[in-house]
Amino acid sequence: MTSNLKYKRVLLKVSGEALMGDKQFGHDYDTIKKIAGDIKELIDSGVEVAIVVGGGNIYRGINAALVGMDRASADYIGMLATVINALTLQNVMESLNIYTRVLSAIPMMSVCEPYIRRRAKRHMEKGRVVIFAGGTGNPFCTTDSAAVLRAIEMNCDVLLKATQVDGVYDSDPKKNPNAKKYFTINYKDVITNNLQVMDLATIAIARENKLPIRVFSIKEQGNIAKVVQDQGEYTTIEE
């Protein structure tokens, strides 16, 4: 079955906000269980999966910096929030009998493994889902940056960016009902038009390494597997 798959190894970027469901803060476990179920569907189809989680449901370093906190310190706190989310997601996934490992860019030996590239790849080869926490381990970098870097390091075929909308638009569709959706768009146009998909430096890294990105809504159950199978609603960013 694996031989017929377009993408055999993927990295899924899940924002912290996606784990909140309709709440204003923290975790909605029904929502997380649905996401875990979608990931299981993908694994059962024969796809190797890695995940990068954000931390915005708990803490946003950039917002704290705006009110006077030292930006580097704020970003480190945000990285710790991603570890909380990774451990939460791991526990929910393991309740569905999905074998997982959490690897953190910030060493926390008593709660998860340190990020070591070869170890992470070995886990994936053994059929385990690897959840990357701690961002890149450096301040002033987004978890989107971590997602692109880890996807490249893991030799993933595609980055799946799960968002609150069903693709990339020329303006915010929540504010502009006439916003135009792109079904495919190249990296250059994302950068030139300053589309707020992810930070532009990260898009440039994806472009340099020819990493395709698919942007889709995580709200629709079953959407992750659909996007990998060229079904459902999404936008593809590639050369």
Swiss-Prot record:
Annotated binding of ATP, by residue: K13, V14, S15, G16, G56, R60, T163, Q164, Y169, D172
UniProt pathway: Pyrimidine metabolism; CTP biosynthesis via de novo pathway; UDP from UMP (UMPK route): step 1/1
Gene3D superfamilies for the chain: Acetylglutamate kinase-like
Catalytic activity, EC: 2.7.4.22
Coiled-coil ranges (or none): none
A single Gene Ontology CC term: cytoplasm
Keywords for the protein's UniProt record, in alphabetical order: ATP-binding, Cytoplasm, Kinase, Nucleotide-binding, Pyrimidine biosynthesis, Transferase
One MF term in the entry's GO annotations: ATP binding
KW ATP-binding (keyword) present: yes
Broad class of where this protein is predominantly found: cytoplasm
Catalytic activity: UMP + ATP = UDP + ADP
Keyword hit for Ribonucleoprotein: no
Compartment annotation: Cytoplasm
Activity regulation: Inhibited by UTP.
One of the GO BP terms on file: UDP biosynthetic process
Binding site for UMP: G55, D75, T136, G137, N138, P139, F140, C141, T142, T143
Xref: InterPro entries: AceGlu_kinase-like_sf, Asp/Glu/Uridylate_kinase, Uridylate_kinase, Uridylate_kinase_bac
UniProt-listed PANTHER family: URIDYLATE KINASE (PTHR42833), URIDYLATE KINASE PUMPKIN, CHLOROPLASTIC (PTHR42833:SF4)
Subunit structure: Homohexamer.
Protein purpose: Catalyzes the reversible phosphorylation of UMP to UDP.
Name of the protein this chain belongs to: Uridylate kinase
